[in-house]
Every structure is written in C-alpha cells, then in structure tokens.
C-alpha cells in the first residue's frame, strides 16, 4: 500500500501491518491536512480533529 505524505506528490510505502492510509484535519480548517500517512487502525474523530481513512493506494 502506498500512502501520500503531508505534502503531495510525495508518498511512502506502508510497512507490514499498516494497511490503511489516513488524513488528519482540524474541523475548523477541513481543507488543510495536519498529518498524513500509514496506520493500522483508524482513530476516532473528536470535536476538534477529523480522521479520514481508506485502503487504496494514495487515497489520502
């Protein structure tokens, strides 16, 4: 699986066991990603932070 880094077009190949790409954004600025990368379990979103997870190449 390949996931985008914080600044596209850079990306990285995920290590074994981390089979989701994720993007973390602040709810007040949803178009500005704070973090991107590979993860094993999608974290729950909160009042301030929103997580978007997916399982295809460079979908974050």
Swiss-Prot record:
SUPFAM superfamilies: Snake toxin-like (SSF57302). InterPro entries: Cytotoxin_Cobra, Snake_3FTx, Snake_toxin-like_sf, Snake_toxin_con_site, Toxin_cobra-type. It comes from the Eukaryota. It holds the Pfam family Toxin_cobra-type. Keywords: Cardiotoxin, Cytolysis, Disulfide bond, Membrane, Secreted, Target cell membrane, Target membrane, Toxin. Shows cytolytic activity on many different cells by forming pore in lipid membranes. In vivo, increases heart rate or kills the animal by cardiac arrest. In addition, it binds to heparin with high affinity, interacts with Kv channel-interacting protein 1 (KCNIP1) in a calcium-independent manner, and binds to integrin alpha-V/beta-3 (ITGAV/ITGB3) with moderate affinity. This is Cytotoxin 3. It comes from Naja mossambica (Mozambique spitting cobra).
